[in-house]
């Protein structure tokens, strides 16, 4: 997980850890722990909320939570190559 990019997106949106903690229904301490951990500690449902709260594109979501592994895997599957530009907003 790219913790620096996650924090940068939060700051860019003028949100505090407290704001995201409230949106996720967790304590501020838990949010701090999740945001500072190199290992992805977010549940799938929490990631969906963060996509909305941080207004993340697919590329940003992939970069933050999966270190671009989703994109790498999709590029290997030829049938997905035609939809990749749509996912990235290109």
Question: What function would you assign to each model-found segment?
Answer:
Residues 1-12:
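A short, Lys/Arg-rich alpha-helix, primarily the initiator
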Residues 6, 20-21, 31-34:
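Conserved hydrophobic/aromatic packing and binding residues within compact polymer-binding modules
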Residues 7, 18, 48:
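Residues within the helices of the helix-turn-helix
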Residues 10, 21, 51:
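The alpha-helix within a helix-turn-helix
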Residues 17, 28-29, 58:
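The DNA-contacting recognition helix of HTH DNA-binding domains
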Residues 25, 43-61:
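DNA major-groove recognition helix of helix-turn-helix/homeodomain DNA-binding modules
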Residues 25-42:
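Recognition helix of helix-turn-helix/homeodomain-like DNA-binding domains
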Residues 33, 59-90:
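Short, charged recognition helix plus adjacent turn
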């Amino acid at each position: 997980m790219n913790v620096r990019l996650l924090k940068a997106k939060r700051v860019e949106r003028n949100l505090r850890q407290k704001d995201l903690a409230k949106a996720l229904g967790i304590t501020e301490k838990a949010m701090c722990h999740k945001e500072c951990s190199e290992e992805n500690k977010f549940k799938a449902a929490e990631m969906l909320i963060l996509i909305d709260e941080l207004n993340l594109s697919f590329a940003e979501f992939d970069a933050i939570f999966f270190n671009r592994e989703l994109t790498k895997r999709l590029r290997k599957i030829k049938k997905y190559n035609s939809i990749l530009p749509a996912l990235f907003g290109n």
